[in-house]
Swiss-Prot record:
One of its GO terms (cellular component) is early endosome membrane. This is WASH complex subunit 3. It is found in: Early endosome. Residues 46-74 form a coiled coil.
Amino acid sequence: MDEDGLPLMGSGIDLTKVPAIQQKRTVAFLNQFVVHTVQFLNRFSTVCEEKLADLSLRIQQIETTLNILDAKLSSIPGLDDVTVEVSPLNVTSVTNGAHPEATSEQPQQNSTQDSGLQESEVSAENILTVAKDPRYARYLKMVQVGVPVMAIRNKMISEGLDPDLLERPDAPVPDGESEKTVEESSDSESSFSD
């Protein structure tokens, strides 16, 4: 034995003289374990089911709200054929503000920009910009009205349009689309001029 009174080699108990474990007690312990485990799993599944039901309800509410918003937007008269005019002065002031370190070269740049601006105005008449395109103009109008931008971007993606063009209304319409729109607009104008 060591200083704590424990045997050094084995337990020192003759196992042939130890009584057997009572079976009723073992069965009671197993039953208690099974009952507690089943109760825990039932509570867990109930909580999960409630949370899933709450999420499902919230998703349905969001879907309903989105449908109502879509219906309200489609009921606004004139939203389909709205064009937004962007003045070229805003564009030049933005470009001048972007280069504050080049103040000594500004007079030369202004004269260059004025001539470049006149050339771009001539070419702008031939190029269809995003602001003048009726497909994009209605989305730009939605932004001005105050519709959430993410909802507009999702709607544009669902219709196959580029949502990044919302931030660049003076950009030209992507290739292939401008020719179609020019033909469609000329067809629609000629149909009204009998």
